[in-house]
């Protein structure tokens, strides 16, 4: 009897772990809030940003990710077309707890951002907690949060032309506001 209870408990725990491993962010769900440091070492609270009733764009990237380096300047161009919409880059390059590696990662990110000549706030997800909350499994991952604070679009990867769908979505928000 004890053995069967143990097997049932073990099966139940396995089911929970399995479901967590395959969890994903779903369109229509509230955007997870988080606290994170910026590249400039300032505090950033997503909960404050969500209060502004405007769409928010999060792009999860890494310095070593080639499609990310292609997407970032394109996102910056799109950002310039939509000045009222907040765009944030979330760096996941240095997922470790080694202080030296974090400093090196910050320098690499700063160098990449300067090289690409983009003007977006960079958030440093050094421990991967934000990427985990947003179920990021592939880079780049682009997430659009609607003015009500809900996930409205999730896109992984980047190929030239992917930005057209983002522009269409953002135009919808701008036209809705008029």
Feature map (PLM): residue ranges:
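Bacterial N-terminal signal peptides
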Residues: 10-19
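Structural microenvironment flanking redox-active thiols in thiol-disulfide oxidoreductases
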Residues: 70-115, 126-132
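Thiol/disulfide oxidoreductase modules built on the thioredoxin-like
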Residues: 115-118, 125-169
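Short pre-active-site segment immediately N-terminal to redox-active cysteine/selenocysteine motifs
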Residues: 53-56, 61-64, 94, 138
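Hydrophobic beta-strand anchors of alpha/beta hydrolase catalytic cores
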Residues: 57-58, 87, 142
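N-proximal helix/coil linker or "cap" segments that precede and/or mark the start of modular domains
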Residues: 18-33, 107
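Positively charged n-region of N-terminal signal peptides that target proteins for export
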Residues: 1-10
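A short beta-strand-turn-helix
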Residues: 35-56
């Amino acid at each position: 009897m004890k053995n069967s209870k143990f097997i049932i408990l073990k099966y139940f725990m396995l089911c929970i772990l399995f479901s967590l491993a395959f969890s994903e962010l779903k369109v229509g769900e509230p955007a997870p809030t988080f606290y994170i440091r910026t590249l400039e070492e300032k505090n950033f609270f997503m909960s404050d940003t969500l209060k502004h009733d405007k769409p928010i764009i999060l792009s999860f990237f890494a310095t070593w990710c080639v499609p990310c380096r292609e997407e970032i300047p394109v996102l910056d161009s799109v950002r310039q077309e939509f000045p009222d919409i907040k765009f944030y880059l979330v760096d996941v390059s240095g997922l470790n707890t080694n202080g030296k590696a974090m400093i090196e990662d910050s320098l690499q990110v700063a160098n990449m951002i300067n090289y690409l000549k983009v003007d977006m706030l960079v958030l440093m997800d050094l421990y991967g907690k934000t990427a985990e909350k947003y179920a990021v499994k592939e880079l780049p991952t682009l997430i659009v949060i609607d003015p009500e604070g809900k996930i409205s679009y999730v896109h992984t990867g980047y190929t030239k032309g992917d930005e057209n769908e983002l522009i269409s979505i953002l135009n919808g928000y701008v036209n809705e506001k008029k």
